[in-house]
Amino acid sequence: RGYRPLTHTAPLKETLAAGLVLLSMWRYDNGEVLLDPMCGTGTIAVEAALIASETAPGLNRGFAAEKWSDGYLKAFMAAREEAMDRRRVLPARKPEMILGSDIDPSSISAAMKNSESAGVSKLIGYSVRDALSYDPTAIRSATESDKVLIITNPPYGERMLDADKASALFSGLGEKWLWSGSVIPGLRLSIIAPKDNFENDFGGFADKRRKLYNGKIQCNMYHYFKSGRKQK
């Protein structure tokens, strides 16, 4: 989309990140904080901010059509101007409604630069933090909200974590975010992960699953939103 000059080993595609936000039914104005605790270079957070501000995809990049004849150029510029007029100017707030954190300081540095490039840096708060530190108390403290949506793309696959390490990570996250197999009250989860064994490792069955591919890796998007439900 033209805003992401900096990436890490296995970056999430911008279009997929935007899809995850939309499929999670998150709205900036409903008071629910969006948190990505393994944000990498910030793609999910940036796409959420672009959606919240109603920024048209590709608005910040150049296109070959801009070099065409005057007739095409006028139509293109008119469309760009219309998109600019529709963009919402959202007030900066503390804490931010969109939060990203990662254990890797260099990833957070890149995420901040990407957010600046996308023009949404005032809408996103970043921190260096281990995702496994986010127990219910820490989530409330970090977000200052009793409604939180966690959307994240944890490391997995050959380029990131081997199967045993990924399994241990998923298990650790489930211990923090689930209670008796169901999501803790006030929290919703949307996690993209390989379809094999995630729910067993995580410690609870998802309330909804969506099949998708992250690059060449067949995954599911696991949605957890029902609290107080007994584990199957």
Where are these regions (language model features)?
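Short SAM/SAH-binding signature in class I
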Residues: 145-153
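Conserved S-adenosyl-L-methionine
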Residues: 12-136
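SAM-dependent methyltransferase catalytic-core segment centered on the flexible catalytic loop
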Residues: 55, 59-86, 144, 156-190
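Short, glycine/charged-enriched secondary-structure capping and boundary segments
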Residues: 49-53, 114-115, 141, 164-167, ...
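Conserved Class I SAM-dependent methyltransferase catalytic core
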Residues: 93-97, 101-110, 158-232
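Non-catalytic substrate-recognition/targeting regions of SAM-dependent transferases
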Residues: 1-5
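Short amphipathic alpha-helix with an adjacent loop that forms part of the alpha/beta core around
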Residues: 134-146
